[in-house]
Design a protein with these regions (language model features):
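Active-site helix/loop of acyl-thioester processing domains in fatty-acid/polyketide metabolism
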Residues: 1, 119-137
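HotDog/MaoC-like acyl-thioester-processing domains
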Residues: 7-94, 144-153, 159-163
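Short amphipathic
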Residues: 99-109
Length: 163
C-alpha cells in the first residue's frame, strides 16, 4: 500500500527572501475512509506564517490499484494535529468558463518519477510555463485525476482570477 497525493492547495502570503531562515512543518489532521488530510506551514524567524497548504492523500493498494482504508494499527501511529485556519477550497477543481486551451505537452522521460508516471512537481512546472513570466502566484491548486505516463499528452487550460 502507498499514500498517493490526490490534491493540494498552497497559499503564499509572501515568498521567503533569498537566505532567509524559515521553519517548515507538517501534520495530519484527519482520516476519512481511504483519505488522509495534511496541512503544511512555513513560518519566518518571528513565527509569522508566510505560506501554508492543505493536501489530500489517498491510500492505494499496490496490487489492485484500488483505494483502501488504513488499518487501526496504521492510524495509531499518526498524531493528529489541529486543522489550520485557512480558506479551504473545494477538493475538486472546475475548469472556469473562459479558460483558454493551452499548447499540448508531450510527456518525455524528464517528466517521470521512479514509478514511470509524471512527478507531482512536474505538473506544477508545466502549469507555470502556461502563465505569464514574472506573475506572482499567491495561490495554487492541483487535483490529480489519473496517472500520466511517457508519450501521453497533457492539455492545459489557463484561467486567471483576480484577488
Amino acid at each position: 500500500m502507498v499514500w498517493v497525493l490526490s490534491s493540494w492547495q498552497i497559499v503564499a502570503e509572501r515568498y521567503p527572501l533569498l537566505g532567509e531562515t524559515v521553519t517548515v512543518g507538517t501534520q495530519p489532521y484527519e482520516f476519512r475512509s481511504f483519505m488522509g488530510f495534511r496541512n503544511f506551514v512555513m513560518e519566518d524567524e518571528a513565527g509569522k506564517r508566510i505560506a501554508y497548504a492543505n493536501s489530500l492523500f489517498s491510500l492505494i493498494d499496490i496490487e489492485t490499484a484500488h483505494p483502501m482504508r488504513p488499518t487501526e494499527e496504521m492510524l495509531e501511529k499518526y498524531v493528529l494535529g489541529e486543522k489550520i485556519q485557512m480558506d479551504y477550497a473545494p477538493r475538486k477543481i472546475t475548469i472556469p468558463d473562459g479558460a483558454v486551451k493551452g499548447e499540448e505537452i508531450l510527456i518525455l522521460p524528464h517528466h517521470l518519477d521512479v514509478n514511470h508516471h509524471v512527478n507531482n512537481g512536474q505538473y506544477v512546472r508545466i502549469a507555470m510555463d502556461c502563465v505569464p513570466k514574472g506573475l506572482k502566484i499567491r495561490q495554487l491548486r492541483v487535483e490529480y485525476k489519473k496517472q500520466v505516463r511517457l508519450h501521453e499528452v497533457l492539455v492545459p487550460y489557463v484561467s486567471r482570477t483576480e484577488t
